[in-house]
Amino acid sequence: MDAMISGKPMPIQSNRDATSSGWTKIAAGIFCWFFLISCSEQVDPLLQKANEEWVQGRNHSAIEIFNEVLKNHPSGTQAEEALFRLGEIHHFSLNNSTRALIYFQEVLQMNRMGPFSYPTQKYIAEIAEFGLKDYDQAIIEYQNLINHYKNENEGSDHQYRIASIYYKKQNYEQALVELNILLENYPDSSWAEESKFKIIEVLYTLSRCPEAREQYRHFTLEYSDSRFKEDMDFVVASCLEEEGHLQEAYNRFKSLEGRYIYPAILKMKLVGIEQRMKKNP
């Protein structure tokens, strides 16, 4: 859930780690790849050795062997894998995302539709957003994922990231557009509920409170037990406060006591409204 400062919500954040593949999944992926590739072509023993070295945490030894694989196989699937693993080592193990980006870009240059293309493009997008904080480039890279890889299960993830980035850039109107695109193109997405909640937040941020309240009304009918209920109640109360409906706003804020995740902010709201009502009884 997002905190709010001075009544305005903080930037949209995914509650899913953008680099959630994790070491266990990476290691599992390495050995699954061995199984698959062994059915179609002979695996260079050096490639297997390099992967084993990385799994064991011997990063520099793995790098040396992967580079030897590239000398022996300057093109083809094994070269693509060597470049891809070099990118992963530098990104995850050596915390050198700039160097990792070079390897990942080489993978795409070698074969944009190869077996490592999609995860490579995901890494590039994530590095642009979270590592380099180059938000304009990150939007381009996430859009590339949507345009070039028709993965319905993850397309909504990429669309959500685009909306989130526009919010980070404080381009709230475009964030609203992107959230609506998500709902239109991926109506059954696991992001649908959260996106509808974020739309309410964005409308409030844009001081479009009547629209925010209308969206809130539809939301509560559709998601009666939403995990965002307290956050939405806070937004609606904030709208009422901004519009001068102080008693109603106060009552809504008061009802959140013991339930809202940020009690200090809630207390600040209540005290502020109490002071306003004393000045203007």
For each feature predicted by the language model, list its residue ranges:
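Acidic, polar-rich low-complexity tracts and alpha-helical solenoid repeat scaffolds
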Residues: 3-4, 9, 35-281
